[in-house]
Amino acid sequence: MRCPFCGHADTQVVDSRVSEEGDTIRRRRRCLSCDKRFTTYERVELAMPTVVKRDGSRSEYDAAKLRGSLALALRKRPVSTEEVDGAVARIEDTLLASGAREVASEHIGELVMNELKRLDKVAYVRFASVYKSFEDIGEFVEAIREMQGPRLGAGKLRKE
């Protein structure tokens, strides 16, 4: 591998470690010319499916867009970056495991909603309100009822 500091073609692997998830190898390398050290990461490159939008247009899968959607819904919520990274990884794993060459944007939206429901209920309602285009307060209430299940009955929403 070429040295990023001096451009020399010969480097030596000093140390290799497998990540905790087992899907990445971290390698410490030393340049045989300038003696500087640097880190590289090796992982399998899999092609994500093409996203088919509601209007029928197609675009490449964009992990930054997925992460941005999650971050927006989770803004000012007590969810760590590691938890967001885990959600992105689970969504991507699901998409890759499907083996599909194309995936509907609606399917990705449903995967995001499932992850948000697990991570943070408020973020779930935020995302659902935009994703499902809520038009009135009744739709918010219905989404909350569905999420809460039988614990939130109609009697608890009435003013006493």
From Swiss-Prot:
UniProt xrefs under Pfam families: ATP-cone, Zn_ribbon_NrdR
So where does this one cross the membrane?
A: none
Q: Output the InterPro entries linked to this UniProt entry.
A: ATP-cone_dom (IPR005144), NrdR-like_N (IPR055173), RNR_NrdR-like (IPR003796)
Q: Which intervals hold the zinc fingers (unnamed)? A: 3-34
Which residue range or ranges hold the ATP-cone domain?
A: 49-139
GO BP term, example: negative regulation of DNA-templated transcription
- Cofactor(s) listed: Zn(2+)
Work out whether the entry's keyword set contains Cell wall biogenesis/degradation.
no
- Name the UniProt key words of this record, in alphabetical order: ATP-binding, DNA-binding, Metal-binding, Nucleotide-binding, Repressor, Transcription, Transcription regulation, Zinc, Zinc-finger
One GO MF term attached to the UniProt entry = DNA binding
Protein's job: Negatively regulates transcription of bacterial ribonucleotide reductase nrd genes and operons by binding to NrdR-boxes.
State the similarity comment.
Belongs to the NrdR family.
Q: What is this protein called?
A: Transcriptional repressor NrdR
Source lineage:
Bacteria, Pseudomonadati, Pseudomonadota, Betaproteobacteria, Burkholderiales
